[in-house]
């Protein structure tokens, strides 16, 4: 029993909708007693996400988990903390600066992360190949999903 909160940035962010559909379907099948509440639409912006959270916070009972496919995690956590509803598990996507700080502080359980540089390199190579600006055959590499916990946070790779 309890509530699982889900959050996407907005309907236009590619990949978030597919994640949400798969997650909700699996959760409904495996844990039918959990109530799923959607807190999507803040576009990962603190103020907008805070407004959305304030509009739903009163109806939240025991928050067992949060699955955030988008941003705005600081706003979500702050609203839940103010309501005394911090979740048992909080899962976020992408190891950006905000999520890095939150996981270092122990406020996130884990972050699902993939290397955006590999994804961008694939897009750039496909562009070059399409316009016949690359003579070698197109070879794409899948970016591997990493599960980042407070115990295995990778070092920051900065390029100058």
Regions found by a protein language model. Name each.
Residues 96-104, 108:
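Flexible loop/hinge segments that line or gate small-molecule binding clefts
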Residues 5-7, 67-68, 148:
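Short hydrophobic segments within beta-strands
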Residues 11, 27, 118-160:
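Hinge/cleft segment of the Venus flytrap/periplasmic-binding protein
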């Amino acid at each position: 029993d309890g509530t699982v909160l889900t959050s996407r940035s907005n309907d236009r962010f590619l990949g978030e909708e597919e994640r949400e559909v798969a997650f909700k379907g699996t959760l409904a099948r495996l844990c039918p007693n959990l109530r799923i509440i959607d807190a999507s639409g803040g576009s990962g912006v603190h103020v907008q996400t805070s407004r959305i959270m304030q509009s739903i916070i009163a109806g939240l009972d025991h928050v067992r988990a949060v699955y955030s496919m988008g941003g705005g995690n600081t706003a979500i956590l702050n609203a839940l903390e103010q309501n005394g509803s911090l979740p048992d598990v909080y899962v976020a996507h992408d190891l950006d600066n905000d999520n890095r700080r939150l996981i270092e502080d122990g406020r996130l359980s884990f972050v699902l992360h993939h290397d955006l540089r590999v994804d961008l390199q694939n897009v750039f190579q496909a562009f070059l190949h399409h316009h016949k600006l690359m003579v070698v055959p197109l070879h794409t590499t899948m970016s591997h999903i990493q599960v980042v916990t407070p115990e295995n946070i990778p070092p920051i790779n900065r390029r100058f």
